[in-house]
Amino acid sequence: MIRQRFSIACPAILVGVTVAAVIGTTGDMMAQVLKDVQTPDTPLVLKAQGSFFVGGEKVEQTQGELGNLGPGGHIAVNQMYVRYMVPQGGDGNLPVVMVHGATLTGKSWETTPDGRMGWDEYFVRKGHPVYIPDQVGRGRSGFNQAVFNNVRAGSTPPANQPVWLRFSDEGAWPNFRFGPQAGAAYPDNQFPVSAVDELAKQGVPDVSFGGVPTPNPTLKALSDLASQLNGAVLMGHSQSGSFPLEAALINPAATKGLVLVEPGSCPARYTPEQIATLAKVPILVVFGDHRDTATGIPTLPSWQNRFEACQALIGRIRSAGGQADMLNPPDRGIRGNSHMIMQDKNNLQIADLILQWIDEQVSKRKAAK
């Protein structure tokens, strides 16, 4: 067991949930309406907000690759869209970059499926500028359509097409650990399963496997973004959980802290030299509850196995003199958190634990230097 290096007193939260859900049927979904979105009592005061792109390259494509919408010519590909909010009075606080997981977009960090405040706004209210990218090939970052149009034109074999990934509602329940099977929530489950249809609406086609170059351009874009911000805390989730590590290896000076939320992997392949580089940056790994739930995806390791792989990585980094911690809410009596921990009913309680870690292990360390 990896010992904790920081302590926060938090009361246990045990929430019983009874769910009557019909999963896997076609037809209209339960619609969220504007009145379901909760408005905080205090205003959100911003110094700035906006959006921009990081990276990208200009390529020339044929008329057919462009879908026959006018002549061939040049377009931009592999750019990363970023939306940001900067709080009034937050000067000097470290920016936080939040990266979404597979088949999702930056929406993961915004208003929760049941209409509560998301981590993007909450971190801003706590004084941190927040930057929310859409991974290259996803959402407003777009994808390179030429690989599909070439197949349609017969110039590329169909087998060369990227795989389009999506999670079904049925698959999300065990893999995201809302319950052991669709419609059967754990008694202490923290995810708002009554709004699970709203989570389904957040899903988008994902061409990460074969639809983006190798290495994934998002990795360098994150490193470049952190550099443009003169240093930032990088936070990844699920598929992107290891992205902050990879960005830190590109430019450790720009990554002031790394937060890995339920990472899909904590790679064991890192060399001693890479571990020494990662040991220069404070790292926090965050996992939820019920990790022994069968994911329903035999080709992937269980969440408990991933948890143990992250413990092993933490051990290697500490042995190299680094600061690395595991935030495991069940150790603190906080039960029932899901894979979508940033959307759980106690999401702000978990956010406070992360914010305290950033303050103690990143901001104060930066100030001391």
Q: What is each residue range found by the language model?
A:
Residues 215-233:
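Conserved acidic catalytic loop of the alpha/beta-hydrolase fold
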Residues 234-235, 258:
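Conserved alpha/beta-hydrolase fold motif
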Residues 92-101:
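Short beta-strand element of the alpha/beta-hydrolase
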Residues 116-141:
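Conserved alpha/beta-hydrolase
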Residues 260-329:
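The feature captures the conserved acid-bearing segment of alpha/beta-hydrolase catalytic domains
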Residues 33-91:
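N-terminal cap/lid segment of alpha/beta-hydrolase-fold proteins
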